[in-house]
Amino acid sequence: MQTQFIKTIEFERPGMESGSSCVAHAWARTPATPSPEEKIALKDRIRHLLKEREAVLVAHYYVDADLQDLAEETGGCVSDSLEMARFGRDHPAKTLVVAGVKFMGETAKILSPEKTILMPDLDATCSLDLGCPVDEFHAFCDAHPDRVVVVYANTSAAVKARADWMVTSSIGLKIVEHLHVQGKKILWAPDKHLGGYIQKQTGADMLLWQGSCLVHDEFKAVELELLKKEHPLAKVLVHPESPAAVVALADAVGSTSQLIHAAQTMDAPEFIVATDNGILHKMKMAAPGKIFIDAPTAGNSATCKSCAHCPWMAMNGLQNLLDVLESGRNEIHVDPEIGRKATVCIDRMLDFAAAQKANVRPSSDLAKEQKLFSGIGPA
């Protein structure tokens, strides 16, 4: 098997003051790609150890297709970060193996403090998490004590511990709308694009932390318009972590689960997809026969026309998954006090969703497609 390699990644790191940011650097360790024969052997050993260790595998839509398939065929879960944690909480397994990025493992631990939470690579992080350091976030909150603090799921446990509400991309609109009706002013973190989208849809008074997802931030509106002309029958599916100019070109705006459902149910032969291309595996399974095209990124540092894949999601592989099952290493720990505080904002969201009996809210420009979004879970 070839040797893994390290690559340096640039991302935007905002400061406390709204609008100020600098270029920061992080790294990702890309695992080697096993041969077909090695894949078979690795999967067989992983299946055996999951059963032997009384463990269950949960994987995000953005990780490698082999991991997604393995999670499903062994009775695990392939979903969004919150549903991964919910599934792990409700599953009888004593050990939960999370194939994703670190905040997902932390959320799983917060919801299941009594369980062992393992991850293939503890260094798999997120630019939204990195771009919202807890000390600066505390200072930001302290500077605006009159605002309700609402944070996106893509944050550390320590940031969640300071929040009044945690939201996912599918229920964020409803929660902010609820707070807006109550006359609340909101401090939002960390994704400026998702926050701006929700602000536009609800009219809420929102002060936005200026973070962004390095994958979604790279989608380009001009190139997307050109691609639409090349594929006139295609519908455009966009995650709201994308820039506003890209969202404006969408036929459907939504969370990962919502976009998969839209691909399955919308009457179109082709779809241009503006989110991490790891989702295409699930879309192709949900809508066989339809064609899926990566939305163009082509950023300044890009080496491909569309290279929309999170480098940290790519750190999850079959070999390091096997390694943690064999060794028990890479366990997620959350300080009990931080976990207790973070539970408050998560439970508040879950209680709100249960009371509403509606976990999603399509964007206003999708009123004609309301039926497509009934009964979809959070993402």
Curated annotation (Swiss-Prot):
[4Fe-4S] cluster binds at C126, C213, C310. It catalyses: iminosuccinate + dihydroxyacetone phosphate = quinolinate + phosphate + 2 H2O + H(+). It comes from Herminiimonas arsenicoxydans. The lineage of its organism: Bacteria, Pseudomonadati, Pseudomonadota, Betaproteobacteria, Burkholderiales. Belongs to the quinolinate synthase family. Type 1 subfamily. It comes from the Bacteria. Iminosuccinate binds at H60, S81, Y152, A153, N154, S169, H239, P240, E241, T256. Pathway: Cofactor biosynthesis; NAD(+) biosynthesis; quinolinate from iminoaspartate: step 1/1. Its main location: cytoplasm. One of its GO terms (molecular function) is quinolinate synthetase A activity. Catalyzes the condensation of iminoaspartate with dihydroxyacetone phosphate to form quinolinate. Keywords: 4Fe-4S, Cytoplasm, Iron, Iron-sulfur, Metal-binding, Pyridine nucleotide biosynthesis, Transferase. It is an enzyme of class 2 (transferase). It is found in: Cytoplasm. GO terms for biological process: 'de novo' NAD biosynthetic process from L-aspartate. This is Quinolinate synthase. Its EC number is 2.5.1.72. One of its GO terms (cellular component) is cytosol. Binds 1 [4Fe-4S] cluster per subunit. Its cofactor is [4Fe-4S] cluster. InterPro entries: NadA, NadA_sf, Quinolinate_synth_A_type1.
